[in-house]
C-alpha cells in the first residue's frame, strides 16, 4: 500500500512540475531541483549518476548561478521526458 501511495505522489509531483514548466511559472534552477527531489536523490548522487557533473555544479544550477550547457540540461531532463528547446512566450 505504501509503495502505491508513493507512486501516486510521484506521479502528482511530476504532473505539477510539468504544468509549472509549461506555464513558465518556475525557474530553470527550481525545475532542476524538483526533478532531483522527485527522483529521490541527493545532490551528490544526482550530479554524478544522472548529470555527470560535480555536486557543486549541480548546486549552482539549482541556485540559478550557473550557465549549464545544452548537453547538461538535456541529461537532466531526459529522465523526465524533456529536452531543451525554444518555446513561444
What are these regions (language model features)?
Residues 1-30, 34:
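N-terminal flexible/basic segments that precede or flank functional cores
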Residues 71-87:
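DNA major-groove recognition helix of helix-turn-helix/homeodomain DNA-binding modules
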Residues 40-59:
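Short alpha-helical DNA-recognition segment
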Amino acid at each position: 500500500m505504501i509503495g502505491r501511495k508513493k507512486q501516486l505522489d510521484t506521479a502528482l509531483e511530476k504532473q505539477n512540475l510539468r504544468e509549472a514548466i509549461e506555464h513558465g511559472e518556475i525557474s530553470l534552477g527550481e525545475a532542476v531541483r524538483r526533478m532531483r527531489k522527485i527522483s529521490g536523490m541527493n545532490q551528490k548522487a544526482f550530479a554524478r549518476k544522472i548529470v555527470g557533473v560535480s555536486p557543486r555544479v549541480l548546486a549552482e544550477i539549482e541556485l540559478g548561478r550557473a550557465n549549464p550547457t545544452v548537453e547538461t540540461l538535456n541529461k537532466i531532463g531526459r529522465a523526465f521526458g524533456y529536452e531543451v528547446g525554444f518555446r513561444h512566450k
